[in-house]
Amino acid sequence: MTDLNKLVKELNDLGLTDVKEIVYNPSYEQLFEEETKPGLEGFDKGTLTTLGAVAVDTGIFTGRSPKDKYIVCDETTKDTVWWNSEAAKNDNKPMTQETWKSLRELVAKQLSGKRLFVVEGYCGASEKHRIGVRMVTEVAWQAHFVKNMFIRPTDEELKNFKADFTVLNGAKCTNPNWKEQGLNSENFVAFNITEGIQLIGGTWYGGEMKKGMFSMMNYFLPLKGVASMHCSANVGKDGDVAIFFGLSGTGKTTLSTDPKRQLIGDDEHGWDESGVFNFEGGCYAKTINLSQENEPDIYGAIRRDALLENVVVRADGSVDFDDGSKTENTRVSYPIYHIDNIVRPVSKAGHATKVIFLTADAFGVLPPVSKLTPEQTEYYFLSGFTAKLAGTERGVTEPTPTFSACFGAAFLSLHPIQYADVLVERMKASGAEAYLVNTGWNGTGKRISIKDTRGIIDAILDGSIEKAEMGELPIFNLAIPKALPGVDPAILDPRDTYADKAQWQVKAEDLANRFVKNFVKYTANPEAAKLVGAGPKA
């Protein structure tokens, strides 16, 4: 949309008055000048690094703030949203329309009388299922982040652009009335699905803008029978599509970035009647301990137009990727075309035939790979077990076990069974097989090597795992291969990694109990109750 008068009027309608200037869909060149210009202070300021990318800091907000997330409860949402409750704790806390109105006025006041950046883009590479997103901010690098992460419209598309959702980023304002309103803190990330607006206040973390729209896709798509997934995806030379589910830090980005396959996307996808499509126009990769040797594609993507968050920049402008003193959750966003080996011109492909669940097991119990039955697929998808890894959320620094429904509970707007149903339906139609891959720890106390995990993924994708002789892991009743090409055979049965196998047994019984306890919350649903037998035997 290039009619700025119309845009100003639409912003006025949202309460943003006396707008000094609109910098509309700025080019990368313009953003670079804006975010590095002399005189910028605090978190507005970008620092040029020797890699060519600009680095910014987000202060104490080095991860998402799930405790500050709210959805307005109204006629649209009261019976559809998976609301937080004692029985099922989640991040979808209801907000009254009165509180929403006061927050909207607060953010509008913050953005009024300012020079504003407005970036318009799409969430979703499927023309049928995408949503048009308009991002409004007073901070240049936030506009840069959005330009990197959302799908950049063509000039033709911009002429007829329709904003289905508007994000008002008021990172510089906080809510003084939070206590009286019964909120968690002065910071807020709030959604009004009826109005099509997201408000951000207090937090500077870039990921709030990206994950906010993911939560909205997770609301709209399953209601239309389209799978909405927290996964990465790639496609082989023969058009075979694989999707990788997993929470942050389990290897979604690393393992789907594969020189032998084209990347569809690294984090958020839909799966409709035509196939798998990316929601995003960029990647948001973790950079802690990043090296050119281990992750050449991601390292090579960190150049001009990439945006680094919370990394340590030395006095000479070089980046110390091993320094986690600000946060373990250091990040980089870059447009997807910074990776050479991607699906072009549109990030979408056919139906998936391999579905991989990545988990980082902090207990050292689960095998590096197991093949799942259809019932186990649904059970482990609903369980979404992993270990939360350091620093992806504020206040989490040590690996702790967690169960996150559908490998993305933080972003689910509907009940988990709705996502499981749509996924299983899509898998049945395409004849897809599912595998559970543990990228975490084993009895040696060490993390399973990337080399071995890559060997496992190769065996899944090239079909050699189907030819392997299989054994069974007790308690979990998982089918595990006895040997795979290029993988250390000593790690395939986790019991073999313990000096004393009885130790594995004790830990396995403990973990099995946790699975059973966690799954109780689903058993009120008759469909989910049938899956109990597919889980471990405590």
From Swiss-Prot:
Cofactor(s) listed in the protein's UniProt record: Mn(2+)
Keyword Nucleotide-binding: yes
Alphabetized GO MF terms: ATP binding; metal ion binding; phosphoenolpyruvate carboxykinase (ATP) activity
Gene Ontology cellular component list: cytosol
Binding residues annotated for ATP, in chain numbering: 152, 211, 230, 246-254, 295, 331, 344, 447-448, 453
Main location: cytoplasm
Cofactor note: Binds 1 Mn(2+) ion per subunit.
Annotated compartments: Cytoplasm
Bridged cysteine pairs (disulfide): none
Gene3D superfamilies assigned: 3.90.228.20, Phosphoenolpyruvate Carboxykinase, domain 1, Phosphoenolpyruvate Carboxykinase, domain 2
Pathway per the UniProt entry: Carbohydrate biosynthesis; gluconeogenesis
Chain residues that bind Mn(2+): K211, H230, D267
Subunit organization: Monomer.
The protein's role, per its UniProt record: Involved in gluconeogenesis. Catalyzes the conversion of oxaloacetate (OAA) to phosphoenolpyruvate (PEP) through direct phosphoryl transfer between the nucleoside triphosphate and OAA.
Assigned protein family: Belongs to the phosphoenolpyruvate carboxykinase (ATP) family.
Designated name of the protein: Phosphoenolpyruvate carboxykinase (ATP)
Organism ancestry: Bacteria, Pseudomonadati, Pseudomonadota, Gammaproteobacteria, Pasteurellales
Gene coding for it: pckA
